[in-house]
Structures are given as structure tokens and as C-alpha cells.
Amino acid sequence: MPVVDIDPDELRRLTGHRSKDDDELRQDLFGLGIEYEGETEDGDFKLEFEADRLDRLSVEGIARSLRYHAGDDRGVDIPDTNAPEWAIDVTDVPADRPYVTGAVIRGVDLDADALDSLIQLQEKLHATMGRKRAKGAIGIHDLAMLKGDTVDGDGTAARSLTYTGIDPDGDTFVPLDDDAERTPADVLTEHPTGETYADLLADHDTYPAIYDDIGLFSFPPVINGRRTEVTTDSRELFVELTGTDQWTIDRMCAIICYALDARGATIEDVTVDYPDRELHRPDFAVRTKHVSHDRIETLLGVEFTTEAVVDLAERAGLDATPTDDGYDVEIPPYRVDVRHPVDVVDDLGRAYDFNDLTPRYPDVNTIGGRTESSRLERSVRQALVGLGFEDLLNFNMTSEAENFDRMRLTPDHDAVGAAQPATIAEPYSQDFTILRTWALPSLAMVLETNTHHAYPQDLAEVGFAAHADGDTQTGVAERRTVAAVLARNDASYEDAKARLQALCDEFAVALETPPTTHPSFIDGRAATIEIDGQPAGVIGELHPGVIVEHDVEVPVAGFEFELDALR
């Protein structure tokens, strides 16, 4: 759970609730689901809150939530933006960090508290949504220190910066907290911040860089140049974000802009010129979620009028437009946590105040117990642990690259794991765009992230896999699967077969393994798993191409089959 340090006096000033004492503030924060964890030596509140409410990573975001909670603000608030005077020209960027966004901030009053809050928000976003800068990184610069080409435009941006890829040993700049000119490669080996984030650019032939007329001033995702350092004297800022996913960096940018808007700053658009399209950023577009009236009443257990729901939505910082069966609810751009209609209902419940809801027992009399399938799954997990495997639980969502490409597989192959995947609508991340069709790729990814640990590594998972199926009500067919890998110097088909045979003996089923071919396994070292005479999965030694793709340093053998075959 994220923890932030908040100055209570600054919180009072931003909310306008100057007369409230610390106890009253703590009570208001508790009403938002924000836990008070104590105070720092300087008297700041240490606050812990839900990991999904990234808009509350700063005092400005918490103040906004308190103002809505108190009824001071209502509905979706979209900041006004001025026409762009700056552009970012995107050319020859590294393929693994192709996206950029930004904003110009004018008229900001950065005293020491405001600057500390901005830096804390930047670093908290890096640690959470930015995945420690791997997915998204923020650079904040003093705009007065930037020099851009001035061109005669037709109402479009007139000053241009360049986001590009450069030679690691090419141009030099003076990084923050330094006084020496260094190349990007030097920064990664000679600067403390560079050493911290060097792994993000390991084995890269080109590094990301942002230039103005003077030269290199930003080396994302590592560090900014000292020339554009932001101080309490800065009144105009340039905010740039780079990353692996446009949606993610756009949402991070929106959170930064809303925080500065709360301090009275003016936001100005930036034109992002990709080779194939032009974007105007920041992106303050609202999203819309439809939620039925019945769902609201069922989940909250309260009967509402249409007018009451619209009022609750406005008090929650949303806007609800009635429809025939419910409401189209507009979501502000900083609310990255609202992904489902249930999230909207949760907001409505908080606006209503959960303390005013009357708990009641369900109108059923049942005696709980494990289902047959749950008992089987538990027994298989215990058996795998007894056979020396580490029991894992991975995400059911993945990407086509992980599920197919890195396993040398395509959806059209006639092989275990090959199937048309169920795709995710409006994916939160390009890392999670489909439901996995098999579990072995998930175990391969775990091996990839644990190459720094000693071998052998014997891993197993009992989980779910799925594929698209138009004949089902949901369009998805789901099944439970058992997968295991053995990573060690002497891993072989025979080792995997021995473990699988022991597992089948435990459940009193007959195992046969006729030879087969599979793109993910070595030819001649793979077999079909037949249990009680029925094909159920595949076993073998992973193909060297798969092993190299995942940077695993030892041979790997593994198997996967359908759990229900053990019934």
C-alpha cells in the first residue's frame, strides 16, 4: 500500500478547511479510506491508502478528494488548456520505448512545500504506475532554460524539441546532482542515479534522449540535465513522459497536471509529432462507463431515485447521465482505478457513506464446503509440493508476445497451447492484452525473472487457461491446467516423465506418452500426455530458442496437461 507524507497545514490551505484541527482532518481522511499511520519528525502526516488510487499520491490529490467528500466540488472537472506553443518531434526512437507525452505549465508558484510535493508525486508515480520507470518515466524541467526552434506556423506549435535515440557514447550533458559533462553511457556507470536504473537500458544499442536547440537535456528514463533543473524560482515548467505504453504515460501526465492545476497553474497543450500521426497532449478526455440502476441498488442494498444517483455521482467527482436502464457515467482522466461498473458503484457507495448502510444477513441457509473440483485442485497442489515443486500462482492475463511469440508458437498451430486467445477490451497495459491459452509461458517468465537465484528451480502451477469460443455465453472457454518446469544443468525429458508418472500414480490414472512434435520443445524430445487413453497435454525438453529468449542459463524440461484428466 502506498504511503505518502502530507503537511496538514498545506492540506488545510488546499481544501479551504483552515479551521479544522488535526483530529478532524484525520477523521475526514478515514472517511475516504485513507489510514493515518503516524507523523514524521517534521509533523507531517504519514498516510496509507488503496494502491489503485494513484491520484492521491500527493497533497493536491488528497485535497481534491476531501473537497468532493465535503461537497465543496461536484462533478467532473476538466482543466482549461491553452493552444500549444511547443512540440515534440519523435524520430528514430528506441523500439522498446517508443511513446512520449507532455505538457507546458505556466504561472506555477513553487514554494519549498509545493516543490517537495511535486517531487514526491513524481517518484511515487515512478514506483507504482511507472513500474520503477520501466513502463513510464517523468521528467520535469524549467521551461525558461529550454530553447526550441521557432518556426512560422499556422496556429500549430512553434517551438520544437526532439525525442530520439542516440549512441550511448555520443553527446554529453551535465546530469542532475553533478558538475561534469558525461555521455549517457558514463551516467550509467559513474552517477548514482544512473547506476540505479542502468538495468533498464542493459544491452541497448541506442538510448532514449530529448534535445532542444542547445543540446541534450533529458536522458529518460534515467535522469534530467542540470541545465533545466526545477527550483523554487521556476515559474514555467515543461513536463515530459516517455514509456512503453501511451495510455499509461498519458494518465501519469494527467495526474501531474491536475496536481499543478490545483495550485493555480495554467496548462498549455504540447503537440507530439509521431511519424504517422499528430497528438495534442495532455490527454484530458473523459471515459464513460455504463452502470445499470439495478446493479447499483443490488450491490448497495438501497433503493435510489434517479436524481439521488446523479447527485451521488457528482459528489464522487463523476457525472451521470440517465439512460433507459441506468446511467452513462463520465470518469475524469486522473481516475485510473475505474475499470468496471462495480468501481463506479463503489464510488457511489462512498459518496452515500458506507456507515449509513444497514448490514443484513443473506436470505439463504447453506452450509459451506469445498466443491469436488476445488478438492481435486488442492490435492494436486499438495502432490506437486511433495514431488519437490515450488507452488506458484501467476496472472491469467498476459500478452500475445509472451503466450505465443516467445514460445515459438502461433494460434494456428495444431499443438497444446495453440488457440485463438480471448482478447481484453480496453487493456490497462500492453503486457495484459489476452487471457493465457496455456500456463507454461507463465512459468518461463518466472524463470526469466529469477536467473539471479541458484539452480535447480523446479516450479509448478495449477491454474486457469482460456481461449475464445463463440459458442459459449461469454465468448470464452475456460479450463484448469497443471504445468511444471524443471530448470537445472541435467534437466531432461526423463526427469519430467518421472515426476509426471509419480503424480499420475498418486491419482491412480494410467499414463502413456507417445512421441509428438511441438514448436516449444526439441524435436525427438517431446511427447503427448495421454491419461487413461485420452490426450491431455504435452511433455518434453524446451527448445533452445525458448530458453535463450527467456535468458535462462540451464536446460529446462516441463509438462502441461488438463487438471480434469486426473478425475
From Swiss-Prot:
GO MF entry, a single one: magnesium ion binding
InterPro entries the UniProt entry points to: aa-tRNA-synth_II/BPL/LPL, B3/B4_tRNA-bd, DNA-bd_dom_put_sf, Phe-tRNA-ligase_IIc_bsu, Phe-tRNA-synth_IIc_bsu_arc_euk, Phe-tRNA_synthase-like_B3/B4, Phe_tRNA_ligase_beta2_arc, PheRS_beta_core
Domain B5: 284-359
Reactions it catalyzes: tRNA(Phe) + L-phenylalanine + ATP = L-phenylalanyl-tRNA(Phe) + AMP + diphosphate + H(+)
GO cellular component term of the entry, any: phenylalanine-tRNA ligase complex
Superkingdom of source: Archaea
Locations listed in the record: Cytoplasm
Swiss-Prot/TrEMBL cofactor(s): Mg(2+)
GO BP term, example: phenylalanyl-tRNA aminoacylation
Keywords: Aminoacyl-tRNA synthetase, ATP-binding, Cytoplasm, Ligase, Magnesium, Metal-binding, Nucleotide-binding, Protein biosynthesis
Keyword Zinc: no
Residues noted as binding Mg(2+) in the record, renumbered to the chain: D337, D343, D346, D347
Keyword flag Lyase: no
Enzyme class: ligase
Enzyme Commission identifier(s): 6.1.1.20
One Pfam family this sequence matches: B5
Family: Belongs to the phenylalanyl-tRNA synthetase beta subunit family. Type 2 subfamily.
Subunit-level organization: Tetramer of two alpha and two beta subunits.
Name by which UniProt lists this protein: Phenylalanine--tRNA ligase beta subunit
Gene name tied to this protein: pheT
